[in-house]
């Protein structure tokens, strides 16, 4: 499942994004809804193995010309105020990860208490885990 989603995400000919949320279980209980600073205090980093894809979609056309920061803020608003009918997760929250593929450049971003923290290497780790 994860490999199929990643393959489609990376091969997309248009801009797309993924919303990842922590799986339920004891291995995620201490990191769920924790800030990136708190993870660092615990000596942890976001682990792709602990996440599941809860949404995959084309990026809205009006995102064209926006910076990643602006696009991420728009997604935050969307997934908190007007979630798509086919979304099967909780509102976008601290500890979630948004993965953007814009103009052929992909990057992963941790939802932090304020803003987003880019996660270099996260996507590569996802590919290895899939």
Residue ranges and their predicted role:
Residues 1-44:
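N-terminal intrinsically disordered, low-complexity, charge/repeat-rich segments that act as generic
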Residues 1-2, 127-130:
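Short intrinsically disordered terminal tails
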Residues 10-13, 46, 93, 104:
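A generic structural signal for short, non-catalytic loop/turn and secondary-structure boundary residues
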Residues 17, 51, 79, 109-110, ...:
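Aromatic side chains
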Residues 44-99:
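Short, conserved turn/kink motifs that form compact alpha/beta structural patches or helix kinks used as
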Residues 88-126:
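Short, compact, well-ordered microdomains
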């Amino acid at each position: 499942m994860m490999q199929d989603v990643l393959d489609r995400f990376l091969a997309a000919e248009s801009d797309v994004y993924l919303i990842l949320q922590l799986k339920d279980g004891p291995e995620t209980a201490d990191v769920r809804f924790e800030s990136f600073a708190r993870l660092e205090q615990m000596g942890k980093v976001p682990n792709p193995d602990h996440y599941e894809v809860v949404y995959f979609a084309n990026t809205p056309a009006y995102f064209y010309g926006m910076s990643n920061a602006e696009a991420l803020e728009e997604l935050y608003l969307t997934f908190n105020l007007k979630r798509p009918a086919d979304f099967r997760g909780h509102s976008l929250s601290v500890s979630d990860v948004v993965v953007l593929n814009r103009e052929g450049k992909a990057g992963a971003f941790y939802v932090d208490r304020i803003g987003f923290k880019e996660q270099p290497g996260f996507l590569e780790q996802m590919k290895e885990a899939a």
